[in-house]
Each structure stands twice: as C-alpha cells, then as structure tokens.
Design a protein with these regions (language model features):
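A beta-strand edge to alpha-helix "cap/lid" segment located at domain peripheries
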Residues: 1-23, 33-119
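Short glycine-dipeptide loop
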Residues: 30
Length: 119
C-alpha cells in the first residue's frame, strides 16, 4: 500500500502491469468514485472492481509519472501523466489523471475520487 500520496499512481501502474484486479481494488476506499471514459461513474468498490477488470483486459504496459501531489492533512490532490503501450501494433493510450486520496488509519493512502482523464 502507498505510504505517501506520491506513491499511489506508480503502485497502480504496477498492479495494472501484473493484471492484479484485487491489488488495484485495494487502492480504493470502499465508497470511492471513478469516472469512466464515457463520463459515467463507477461508485463503490464492487463497481470499481468491475471497471478495473475491464481496464486490465486492455493489456499493454502502463507507466505513470506524477505531475504533483499536494497533501493537506489526511487528504491529498494527486495528478499524473500516464500511458499504456502495446506491442501488437495498437496505438498507445495516454492521459492525464487527477485524484483525491485519503490517508488511512494505518498510514497508507487510498483513492477517494479517481478521474483518469481529469488532469
């Protein structure tokens, strides 16, 4: 689990590259919200887990580079440039994300709001 807000997006990319939906879902609070590419929202961990399952089916290799991580108490605003590259000729996918993360009682950080295209 991320020990600082700046760690979370790199840990997400590692989970994506391992195709580990459960490791990815563990990065979210139970009632978190993720914005989907079509503008709809995945609300709550069950919907987020389904979203993540569809995401990892894309395959490829994800990298994520933080643009900033701004902490304020137990909350932080994080943004990153990310990309998924493919070896099968598909065009790479890129984006700029914006997330709100919250520090948990154990000191780790989890997503509260995740907007993969909101940066």
């Amino acid at each position: 689990m991320p020990s600082t807000p700046a760690d979370i997006n790199a840990i997400f990319a590692a989970g994506y590259n391992a195709r580990d939906v459960e490791a990815l879902a563990a990065l979210y609070e139970h009632d978190a919200v993720v914005t989907n590419p079509d503008g709809s929202m995945a609300v709550g961990i069950d919907a987020i887990r389904m979203h993540l399952g569809q995401l990892v089916e894309l395959g490829g290799f994800m990298t994520s580079h933080n643009r900033y991580a701004i902490p304020n108490g137990d909350l932080a605003l994080v943004a990153a440039d990310w990309e998924i590259e493919f070896t099968d000729g598909r065009e790479r996918i890129t984006g700029r994300s914006a997330e709100v993360v919250r520090q948990q009682l154990d000191g780790s950080w989890r997503y509260v709001l995740d907007h993969p295209g909101g940066g």
